[in-house]
Amino acid sequence: MVKIKTTHVGSLPRSNELSSLLASKDNQEKIDISSFDAMVKKNVSEVVKKQINSGLDSVSDGEMSKISYATYIKDRVDGFSGESERKAPKDLDDFPSFKKKLILSGGTPTYKRPCCTSELKIKDEVSVKKDILNFKNALEENSHTDGFMNSPSPGVICNFLPNKFYKNDDEYLEKLSDIMKFEYEKITESGLYLSLIHI
């Protein structure tokens, strides 16, 4: 019988405590970094165990350390500031009462979405290494080796953190590709699979 390996994609639920810390961090409020790191480590360990126990073959760290799957880049790369215009999905335009209800219920993301306003430069080389270490430790705790780590494609970053500095989006995408190479290489060099998010 042929075994078909199973996996999934996307962020996984964080604990209320971690969600609160991520929101505070995103709002540039002062947080205790050692407490944050410990909470991320705990959440990664728990989410890896849950995935394995559910029968998945290839598991992820659930993106526990990140406020969102794309905008966390603003915390690791210099060159972003301000706030970008938020556009509701086009399909909601056909249902204005539902769209209004969704907005009033808090069903729209409130995390920061700045624009690229200056030259992009890596400012944080440590966070991706922490993510990898937490994930590899959680895999080892569970005697599991098949793991993948998500990272946004340059196109996704361009969509969520729009260009207001480079002469056009092609130049912006090229610069993002150069910048993201660091994170992509760290993930693959660690022996983990790299899952590029492109939507």
Could you tell me what each predicted segment is?
Residues M1-I197:
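Domain-level signal for soluble alpha/beta catalytic cores
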